Amino acid sequence: MSEAAGEIRNDWSVEEIVTLHNLPLLELIGHANAVHGRHHNPNVVQKASLLSIKTGGCPEDCAYCPQSAHHREVKLTKDRLMQPETVLALAKRAKDAGAERFCMGAAWRQVRDGKEFDAVLTMVRGVRDLGMEACVTLGMLEKHQAEKLAEAGLTAYNHNLDTSPEFYGEIITTRSYADRLETLSIVRSFGIDLCCGGIIGMGETIRDRASMLQVLASMRPHPESVPINALVPVEGTPLAAMPRIDPLELVRMVATARIVMPKSTVRLSAGRSTLNREAQILCLVSGANSVFYGDTLLTTPNAGIGEDEALFAAIGALPHEAAPLAAE
């Protein structure tokens, strides 16, 4: 198959991606591994740490999210925006534990100018001064705000598509798909890397998964980072009763993402704590080359650092070098 060559394409059709996704599993993994080896050192796995810097009270109605103010049955402690010195102390701790990227998430619908945004800029500058990559997820933003983030040295902005355009309305009604794409366009116009992926296991079809990947792969260039999340059902959210996905579904999604976006960093994200060591290794063989590292991802559990250290030692993983500051 030509896909094994790992050519960069922006013209994938949904049908092509569905066919690719549904290949016999070993054949799919073989193609994905070949593409991965052509564009990446297969032994390098980036470790990213994720911190919720402002928790709960979000006005969005995302069906999967415990931080939504719409889901009043969720037992979640709401917290105001953390102080920069507290965040930077945790970033230093994450770096000392081996993390190379520090991601900060605020449960906002959109960025608003003022003291809180200024505090986020201070956090970004501080993380970069530690020699780490800095990523934030803050919701929608305007051009002047993206410019300020770029000036602060922000490496990447996370803004996920979550799912396909066709299934999106079943999951979120308070923000349109077009809103998300506009935010991504603004971010990229200021030279900030895109961290953009989605979630599987929310009731979508295989075609929905392929459609989401098609939207991502049509971007020029492809997103620099593509997080692949498996739904973590949370009591009190509309998706609380959804069954856990089969780990091999996550393997297929990772492998397909790797083939259609050969140069992107594919990040194994939420839901990893439910995978045993062998399933995680299978995802890495299939093209994942980054994981979220730390005990908690925003408000959901993650694999423990000790478990991860044992995993990386077992596979001989090498560290990823943080991106340099623009002035360097």
Swiss-Prot record:
Highest taxon above the source species: Bacteria
Enzyme Commission numbers on file: 2.8.1.6
Required co-factors: [4Fe-4S] cluster; [2Fe-2S] cluster
Annotated catalysed reactions: (4R,5S)-dethiobiotin + (sulfur carrier)-SH + 2 reduced [2Fe-2S]-[ferredoxin] + 2 S-adenosyl-L-methionine = (sulfur carrier)-H + biotin + 2 5'-deoxyadenosine + 2 L-methionine + 2 oxidized [2Fe-2S]-[ferredoxin]
Binding residues for [2Fe-2S] cluster: 103, 135, 195, 267
Quaternary state and interactors: Homodimer.
HAMAP family: BioB
Protein name: Biotin synthase
Organism whose genome encodes this protein: Allorhizobium ampelinum (strain ATCC BAA-846 / DSM 112012 / S4) (Agrobacterium vitis (strain S4))
